[in-house]
């Protein structure tokens, strides 16, 4: 009987929580986001929780953008750009200066850490910081979720099975979130960020409920037309070729939009060449057409994916290109911009998206 008891009795072994969270050195902050323990790429500094930029983008809010070359953090709002410099308590919302009572952005080498308080200003999330070990529980998934109540004081184990080490103790009436169901065990998340297993018989009142919080999401508007858009490319290679617009319009029946190839990226500093024509725009408007001028990253000074990356990965270079583009648009009365970039590598994708965001704000 003693042998059987030893074989089948629950283990009292405690799991190494630093190992569980992946903590390898002092000062690291473990992170649980919704139902996932992620790499401990956080830290506590001056009493504030900071999360590494890569974790923020991947798990919390992908709209944050860090430029390590120019040491600036950006966040795009519908009509404004938020910018933060390293080590500062101040930040800009377009031209308006605002301040917090903590340093918003810290760096270690080229790695950026963003204050969780600042992240939460722009993210529909809740979080709580706990000790022993230092960890943060972040909830950002809202809507329907399955929960249950702990029936009696018990343990959350690392894996399903009574011989698996204990992660945490839970008390009668505690509520846990159900992550997965197995035959005799359920994978659960505790309110303080442990994800492990509890026996089915130790749970009761399983139910699906809707969780939410008060948060005013930013409204990103768009433009739509009440007609079918029929657009023609107009390959314009020099200023003289702009004179062929009337012939182009006459040859194309049912057009609503024409896209002349007027703008070409000149170099990796964000300068551009333009052959835009106000007369061309006037002729098109008289014919009832909108002009959506194209900007290209080819047939100009950019000749490779690497050069497009050099251009778009620097915030000042994107800004230079956007300012020149908007200036030309306003000068000749263009109705829209057609971005025709074809030298975008996978590594450049995040920078290209940021370019489009910044361009949309200026538009």
Regions found by a protein language model. Give the residues of each.
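Primary recognition of N-terminal secretory signal peptides and signal-anchoring hydrophobic helices
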Residues: 1-182, 212-224
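Extracytoplasmic/secreted proteins, especially bacterial periplasmic and envelope-associated proteins
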Residues: 51, 55, 114, 118, ...
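SH3/SH3-like beta-barrel fold
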Residues: 75, 173, 185-190, 198
